[in-house]
């Protein structure tokens, strides 16, 4: 018998979601890569696997695999999908869940309008926690590229590593070419997600994100959180920021640098299917 899956998305950042509570699922890197192919597989940005947890206080394990098969520690858009998936398929009757990823714990709250708020934890700036190879923590870092040019960027971890660049216009930003160079830069030993941020006003930014292992996606929840945190810390934006991505808007709330940062946005079901091989 094949493995049942559900296709979901958060603002167009698309996933297959697998129930590992009621099914035994062991996918290899090669299998995930084949399934992610949009011509010969299903096609998705990430594969999400929800599993039972044996740890007190944790409702589920939440595993995230990029399209290249790499398991990563954070996906905010996926977390919203996981919350609605768990309730819809009867894995829980709760509206507030705690899930454990490879790197962090996340609190998920299903709101009355079926949007989901995700506690993304306290952002981390220390180079060793990102990780980034740097002698000391700095508001901004300079990276030398293969072509001899240098680029200035901010670096932060929100459960996964992010670089954030301030640009004048995201429509003309070299997201794919420069994003790829930065993502694979040796100063980021685990690769890095790269956000191109345009500040619109005190409460709004526009953003495009090159995701490690995926390329540019039309929405990235953790990227929105990372960019909003950088905007608040270094550009004096509000404690409530609307992040406009190609796929739609996310709301980020961060009352102070020592508090957890909260991501709120939608999630949607698309279809169900069965993996035959």
UniProtKB/Swiss-Prot annotation:
The pathway noted for it is: Amino-acid biosynthesis; L-lysine biosynthesis via DAP pathway; DL-2,6-diaminopimelate from LL-2,6-diaminopimelate: step 1/1
What's any GO biological process attached to this entry?
A: lysine biosynthetic process via diaminopimelate
Residues flagged as site, Could be important to modulate the pK values of the two catalytic cysteine residues: 162, 211
* The UniProt record lists the keyword Isomerase: yes
- Give GO MF terms, alphabetically: diaminopimelate epimerase activity
Locations listed in the record? Cytoplasm
List the HAMAP family.
DAP_epimerase
What does the protein in this record do? Catalyzes the stereoinversion of LL-2,6-diaminopimelate (L,L-DAP) to meso-diaminopimelate (meso-DAP), a precursor of L-lysine and an essential component of the bacterial peptidoglycan.
Q: How does it assemble?
A: Homodimer.
Q: Would you tell me the protein name for this molecule? A: Diaminopimelate epimerase
What is the organism of origin for this protein? Legionella pneumophila subsp. pneumophila (strain Philadelphia 1 / ATCC 33152 / DSM 7513)
- What's the source species' lineage? Bacteria, Pseudomonadati, Pseudomonadota, Gammaproteobacteria, Legionellales
């Amino acid at each position: 018998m094949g493995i049942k899956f559900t296709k979901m998305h958060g603002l167009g950042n698309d996933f297959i979601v697998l129930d590992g509570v009621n099914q035994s699922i062991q996918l290899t890197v090669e299998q995930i890569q084949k399934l992610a192919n949009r011509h010969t597989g299903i096609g998705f940005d990430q594969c999400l696997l929800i599993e039972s947890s044996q740890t007190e206080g944790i409702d589920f394990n939440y595993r995230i695999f990029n399209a290249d098969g790499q398991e990563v520690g954070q996906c905010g858009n996926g977390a919203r999908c996981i919350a609605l998936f768990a309730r819809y398929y009867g894995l829980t009757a709760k509206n507030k869940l705690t899930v454990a990823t490879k790197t962090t714990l996340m609190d998920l709250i299903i709101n009355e309008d079926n949007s989901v708020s995700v506690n993304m934890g306290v952002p981390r700036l220390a180079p060793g926690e990102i990780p980034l190879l740097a002698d000391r923590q700095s508001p901004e870092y300079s990276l030398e590229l293969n072509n001899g040019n240098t680029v200035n960027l901010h670096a932060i971890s929100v459960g996964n590593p992010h670089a954030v660049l301030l640009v004048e216009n995201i429509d003309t930003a070299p997201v794919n070419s420069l994003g790829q160079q930065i993502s694979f830069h040796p100063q980021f030993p685990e690769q890095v997600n790269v956000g191109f941020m345009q500040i619109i006003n005190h409460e709004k930014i526009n953003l495009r994100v090159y995701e490690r292992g995926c390329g540019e996606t039309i929405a990235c929840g953790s990227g929105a959180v990372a960019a909003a945190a950088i905007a608040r810390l270094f550009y004096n934006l509000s404690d409530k920021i609307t992040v406009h991505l190609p796929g739609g808007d996310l709301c980020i709330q961060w009352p102070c640098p020592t508090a957890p940062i909260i991501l709120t946005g939608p999630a949607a079901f698309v279809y169900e299917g069965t993996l035959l091989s």
